[in-house]
Amino acid sequence: MEKYKVIVDTNLWISLLIGKKLSELYSVCNSEIVDVYICNELKEEFMRVASQEKIRKYVTNERVIQTLELMEASCIFSSIKKTVVSSELRDINDLYLLAFAETIKADFILTGDKDLLSLQSHNQTKIVTYREFDEIIKK
């Protein structure tokens, strides 16, 4: 059985970090039908956001380290080898996710970002919420 290639956007990692109803993300990361991919840029964005004061008041250093350890233990690391220029995306800081999706030929980007979700897809990659993806893999 072929596995789904999935990229989990930083906003979902942060939601997992602060415990907002995404504890199931742990099981997705360890699923037999899903390979979650990570790149330096995504990890750096996670660290940058996790260190912001508005996030730090909800989490301990230990929790940040646990989430990073989950990423490193459960995800496949890859580098971005493509460049994407998109006039459809308002936040140019998210272009790396599209480039990463092209590089690994991702099946899905999981996100809560409304701008990314409005694209619905990028080349072969579907852009969906965690809940939508959960419904897809339960079928």
Can you annotate each of these PLM segments?
Residues 20, 41, 62, 131-132:
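Short beta->alpha linker loops
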Residues 15-16, 49, 58, 119, ...:
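Residues that scaffold the ATP/ADP-binding catalytic core of kinase and kinase-like folds
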Residues 73-108, 114:
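Active-site neighborhoods of divalent-metal-dependent phosphate/nucleic-acid chemistry enzymes
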Residues 28, 100, 119:
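Hydrophobic/aromatic ligand-binding patch that stacks against planar heteroaromatic rings
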Residues 1-38:
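Short, well-structured N-terminal submotif of metal-dependent ribonuclease cores
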